[in-house]
Amino acid sequence: MNAMQPPQSVEEIKAGLETTEKGGVRQSIRNCLTVFQRDPLLSGAIAYNILTDRKDIIKPIGFHRESTALNDTDMKYLLLYLEETYGLTNEKKIDNAIGIVANENKYHPIRDYLSSLVWDGTERIRFCLRHFLGADADDYTYEALKLFLLGAISRAFQPGCKFEIMLCLVGGQGAGKSTFFRLLAVRDEWFSDDLRKLDDDNVYRKLQGHWIIEMSEMMATANAKSIEEIKSFLSRQKEVYKIPYETHPADRPRQCVFGGTSNALDFLPLDRSGNRRFIPVMVYPEQAEVHILEDETASRAYIEQMWAEAMEIYRSGRFKLAFSPDMQRYLKEHQRDFMPEDTKAGMIQAYLDKYTGSMVCSKQLYKEALNHTFDEPKQWEIREINEIMNQCITGWRYFPNPRMFSEYGRQKGWERENPATDSGNPSEKTMDGFVEVAEQMELPF
């Protein structure tokens, strides 16, 4: 089958339609399909929009329309046209033919847009967030925005590809953070900020047809539980959803990416293991070269060329949808600026800065660093201390084989990476009550 066969005149089409034994036009899908493929008004008019997962009418067909999406009013006009012109009246057969001809005439508006762009050679990704929002023009900001753009392009050309990153613009109330994401989506219908519930059965409907989705309200009210829900949501690559008029549910691979905005600096709950999915960029509107709405036409032109630059990188294939290991380490440290102060980690670090022994254990830190002299730690408190030592404290190395502590018995713990004692004598008893024994020391018996 070919949905784009050369148009014919109405009389030629009528002459070629299948007829009944009595000479009337046969009410068949084949006849309806022939009309949609060859009628001078309808040929090439109906297409399947891969982005919206809907049928569109993509050229004028003789009556006024408000949008491209095929709707109930359009169907009434089409039924009337096929009845009056060809005597085709079976609504179900006509609808089936529309489904077939649309499926044979697919298009993706974002792919078409991106593929049409030609870069002028001027670098903009590195300076964009500085230009519009006053962010630092450093390597981190450049890599953050570049990664987000490449993720968006990849999701358009490869729906459902793995991309778990959320670019978060932080600070600067009234700076234009939400407007930046809206203009980044190029067309307003490709942008949405209407995602409110992540556990909604109809969440696919909120994503459908959108490319850039801003999470503003959720980031503003985020807590430890909701952040975990957002992280889980970001990791999904598809939704399973049954459109009301369809019989069976189907996988709907994601074609969108998610951006976050927050006026509060400490929008990330404390997470010592890191929130690798969230990439925060601080904005300073007073340092911006231009407000993004000062000249919207110029801003859109700038952003369009930025997409063209990103497409050059995408076409080259020389990229990964993840930070480099060095940038990942920087991100982990940088994220701490956007979390509440970690008071327990600070207390443990202060204790270790003054401590002269060569090893410590969780119970020791609980009692001596966190000042629980007469209490016994609960299991979750032990896990929290372990997390602090393993994720936040440097200069100490974990040992898994229990050693003897004079006050706390046999315990797993941490030793200095460069052990130090008061006198330098390896056999001298340290403050933790443990006697260091040199590996090659001759035993006195």
Across the structure, where does each feature detected by a protein language model lie?
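Residue-level preference for alpha-helix termini and adjacent loops
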Residues: 40-41, 45-50, 56-57, 62, ...
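P-loop NTPase catalytic core of nucleic-acid-dependent motor ATPases
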Residues: 98-208
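Feature primarily recognizes SF3-like P-loop helicase cores of small DNA viruses
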Residues: 80-108, 162, 189-193, 199-234, ...
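N-terminal nucleic-acid engagement/recognition segments and initiation subdomains in replication
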Residues: 1-124, 139, 143, 375-376, ...
